[in-house]
Amino acid sequence: MRLSSTTFVVLAAVLLASGTAVSKADETGVTNVNAVHSPNVLAGVDKRFLRSHHTEDGEAKLSNYDNEERNGLFGANTLSNMGKDTILRFQMFTKWKANGYLPKKIKDDIPRSLYKAYKIHYRMN
């Protein structure tokens, strides 16, 4: 009994001693950190244009990828990938059903093969 309690006390002391040594090592050298400024940032011209391409007249136009992304559930790229990937097809069918898309309403918006598969999925789930 004395050996186990002595071992416990020694281990606790070692852990406490090593914890304080590590924390003191982390404190050194951190006090003199300066902010890094980009040389490309000009005063007043720090506006970022994400996902857009600016033309000469100053208007932003979305790329084809961005337009496709905004088409969401019925984008051409999404429908094409659904024809190849059965897992994606099942996930999208589940989203369509959760959003209330009836097979009859989306018949003209999707390829015939996907329509048939969605009709079966809609009835089964």
From Swiss-Prot:
Gene deletion effect: Leads to the gain of virulence via impairing effector-triggered immunity (ETI) allowed by host resistance (R) protein Rps1d.
Chief place of localization: secreted
Pfam families on file: RXLR
Signal peptide, first to last residue: 1-25
GO CC field: extracellular region; host cell
Expression induction or repression: Expression is induced in preinfection structures and during infection.
Motif position, RxLR-dEER: 48-70
Keyword check for Transmembrane helix: no
Keyword Signal recorded: yes
Recorded family membership: Belongs to the RxLR effector family.
Protein name, entry field: RxLR effector protein Avh6
Organism field: Phytophthora sojae (strain P6497) (Soybean stem and root rot agent)
